[in-house]
Amino acid sequence: MKPKTFYNLLAEQNLPLSDQQKEQFERYFELLVEWNEKINLTAITDKEEVYLKHFYDSIAPILQGLIPNETIKLLDIGAGAGFPSLPMKILYPELDVTIIDSLNKRINFLQLLAQELDLNGVHFYHGRAEDFAQDKNFRAQYDFVTARAVARMQVLSELTIPYLKVGGKLLALKASNAPEELLEAKNALNLLFSKVEDNLSYALPNRDPRYITVVEKKKETPNKYPRKAGMPNKRPL
């Protein structure tokens, strides 16, 4: 996808980009490729592929009407090079975005990126999702949690649901639909007082299938969740 195609597709969906936003995406691409030489951020470095499979793919929650352009608090777990939250932040500057990542090198990249792109209202923390979720400054503080290709729902729910306010939503972006994954996660979702509200399917402009599972938090998460770092993965609920 050429950058111009990216701009045109957004304009067609009533999301025209300003010159500043176009420059932000362009600089994002440049820094991603430059830093990818030093630390492993992505296997995708071809410009047209980055615009399609990282930038366009990341803004799917906005294109699907799931996220409003308001000062809402969004947490991105395991964002890697900033996907999906930072492309959404460029599009919707009102969003207040927090990223937690377990690799300090990636956090360094994200801090530089935010500085270069002049993004305000972005916060980066180095550490494990399981640990921050027990901190009252993070627990039950967010309207949305996003996770793009992070883990199976059975594991992901325990890592993310505790961060949501009651009524808040987890948006899990995936490249493959796995109905059995949601069946496996049924027990975990019940224990975490949360419920699958929707499982959206759509396609990228090149026809690659994509899915977003929307999970709503119905009641406060019991204090014992999430368990200690590593446990959700080792022994899923």
Swiss-Prot record:
Its main location: cytoplasm. It is found in: Cytoplasm. It holds the Pfam family GidB. SUPFAM superfamilies: S-adenosyl-L-methionine-dependent methyltransferases. Coiled coil: none annotated. S-adenosyl-L-methionine binds at residues 78, 83, 129-130, 148. Keywords: Cytoplasm, Methyltransferase, rRNA processing, S-adenosyl-L-methionine, Transferase. One of its GO terms (cellular component) is cytosol. Its EC number is 2.1.1.-. Residues 218-237 are annotated as: Disordered. GO terms for molecular function: rRNA (guanine-N7-)-methyltransferase activity. It is an enzyme of class 2 (transferase). Belongs to the methyltransferase superfamily. RNA methyltransferase RsmG family. PANTHER family: S-ADENOSYL-L-METHIONINE-DEPENDENT METHYLTRANSFERASES SUPERFAMILY PROTEIN. Specifically methylates the N7 position of a guanine in 16S rRNA. This is Ribosomal RNA small subunit methyltransferase G. The gene is rsmG.
